[in-house]
């Protein structure tokens, strides 16, 4: 079990399957298998803008089939297959709009 990001080889490529095993407090994203550290907590201005934008989007999509999510929310971008071992990109956008319910599962968006 990996409990600290310093236990990982940052030159190695990782998958979503690896990501699910990590239990450290640092926020990260995977981009083509590479680990990218996210800022620990967005500043107040960022949160204020993000909150206002989420509110506007909520109103715009209220009567549509689209659903809105805010971070932390895993967005997995598969290239070859949908198995956890085949996914090398996992992002956590501030706001995510998903209009295809087939892309949602208990772990986020695929």
Label the predicted regions:
Residues 1-110:
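Gly/Pro/Ser/Thr-rich low-complexity, intrinsically disordered segments predominantly at protein N-termini
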């Amino acid at each position: 079990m990996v409990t600290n990001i310093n236990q990982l080889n940052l030159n190695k490529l990782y998958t979503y399957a690896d990501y699910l095993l990590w239990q450290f407090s640092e926020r990260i994203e995977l981009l083509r298998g590479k680990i990218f550290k996210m800022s620990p907590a967005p500043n107040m201005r960022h949160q204020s803008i993000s909150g206002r934008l989420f509110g506007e989007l909520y109103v715009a999509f209220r009567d549509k089939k689209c659903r809105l999510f805010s971070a932390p929310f895993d967005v997995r971008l598969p290239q070859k297959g949908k198995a956890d071992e085949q996914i090398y990109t996992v992002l956590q956008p501030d706001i995510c709009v998903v209009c295809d319910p087939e892309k949602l599962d208990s772990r986020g968006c695929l």
